[in-house]
């Protein structure tokens, strides 16, 4: 029987919330019926950015931010219901990822932790719909990275029986899925996505992102700085691996800008764009040289300069937006969490040990009944 599920995603780019209403078949095949998006209210975005780092009174602030997120999520759910003409009782579940503010797998005590701010109980109360949340912790408990979780979804949506396909999600952090026609699906975080570019753009232009990559295109890449950025150890660590703003944050960037204080801001932006492009293209070339197509999703797919550089770095591979495959780039991750929620309520495993390094496949998510 076809199930209607809602997926909600607010990623490490911190640009806002994307929501989709999707129809999902028992086989896992799905189609997106409606999409809604809402930027973060500036005060909430500012608080979430601060909570990516240790600070005073952070437990109190985190709890209030989780409540605010739940209310913002509920508003997106209400919009999707209005737009579709559906009632709350028609929806099987909401998959609400939450907002990642810490991601430190396999550290400290050997298990580590991942923390996504969310109040799924409040969201269930406000929406009248079962909510699935906390998708990553179960994989960590099984010895995995807890990320990325979307390669299984990518395989279902973009995989082909006759050729290897690579899928690159460029949100705040970038991650790559390698989908062979036969064999294990692979996936990992490449490193930076939009996070550093967006930070620099906001700092120097007051804009939340570099529209079309036009500002970066106006600058000149600083080769010495780019080489310094590319020396980051994470980039040279073999998969499975995952990262977040714990690593690629403004302090990380400031530490590496020492000696470049006189560089023009647009040149730094050009260099940060080249950094993301090279980190991603190198991973695709090294781990999926046979892929004829690199499908790009997330906000980075809308950055023309980034897409141009990815294509230049992968001349034998067609670099295309997920839009070319019927799924707009800003809808892909939200659709993935609708799909993961459906898996959870059916008690079906959704993690891939070949991706996260976990001891086995696990059912992901915790259910908060309406």
Where are these regions (language model features)?
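Phosphate/ATP-binding catalytic cores across multiple sugar-kinase/actin-like superfamilies
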Residues: 72-80, 265-290
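Phosphate-binding/catalytic loop of phosphoryl-transfer enzymes
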Residues: 4, 109-114, 121-125, 129-208, ...
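Glycine-rich phosphate-binding loops at beta-strand->alpha-helix junctions
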Residues: 101, 291-313
């Amino acid at each position: 029987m076809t199930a209607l599920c809602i997926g909600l995603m607010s990623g490490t780019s911190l640009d806002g919330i994307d929501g989709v209403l999707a129809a999902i078949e028992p086989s896992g095949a799905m189609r997106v019926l409606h999409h809604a998006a809402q930027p973060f209210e500036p005060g909430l975005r500012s608080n979430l950015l601060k909570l990516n780092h240790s600070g005073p009174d952070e437990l109190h602030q985190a709890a209030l931010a989780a409540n605010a997120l739940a209310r913002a999520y509920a508003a997106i759910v209400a919009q999707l219901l209005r737009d579709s003409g559906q009632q709350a009782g028609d929806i099987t579940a909401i998959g609400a990822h939450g907002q990642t503010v810490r991601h430190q797998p396999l550290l400290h005590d050997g298990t580590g932790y991942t923390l996504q701010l969310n109040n799924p109980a409040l969201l269930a109360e406000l929406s009248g719909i079962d909510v699935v949340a906390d998708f990553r912790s179960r994989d960590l408990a099984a010895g995995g990275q807890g990320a990325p979780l979307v390669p299984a979804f990518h395989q279902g949506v973009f995989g082909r029986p006759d050729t290897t396909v690579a899928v690159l999600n460029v949100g705040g952090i970038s991650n790559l899925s390698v989908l062979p026609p036969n064999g294990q699906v692979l996936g990992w975080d490449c490193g930076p996505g939009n996070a550093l570019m967006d930070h620099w753009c906001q700092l120097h232009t007051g804009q939340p992102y570099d529209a079309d990559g036009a500002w970066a295109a106006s600058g000149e890449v600083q080769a010495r700085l780019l080489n310094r950025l590319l020396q980051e150890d994470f980039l040279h660590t073999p998969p499975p691996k995952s990262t977040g703003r714990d690593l690629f944050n403004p302090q990380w960037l400031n530490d590496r800008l020492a000696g470049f204080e006189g560089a023009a801001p647009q040149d730094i932006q050009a260099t940060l764009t080249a950094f993301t492009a090279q980190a991603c293209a190198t991973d695709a070339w090294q781990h999926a040289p046979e892929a004829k197509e690199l499908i790009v999703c997330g906000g980075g797919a809308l950055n023309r300069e980034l897409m141009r550089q990815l294509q230049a770095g992968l001349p034998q591979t067609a670099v295309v937006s997920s839009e070319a495959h019927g799924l707009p780039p800003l809808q892909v991750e939200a659709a993935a969490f609708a799909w993961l929620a459906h898996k959870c309520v059916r008690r079906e495993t959704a993690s891939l040990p070949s991706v996260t390094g976990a001891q086995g496949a696990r059912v992901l998510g915790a259910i908060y009944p309406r």
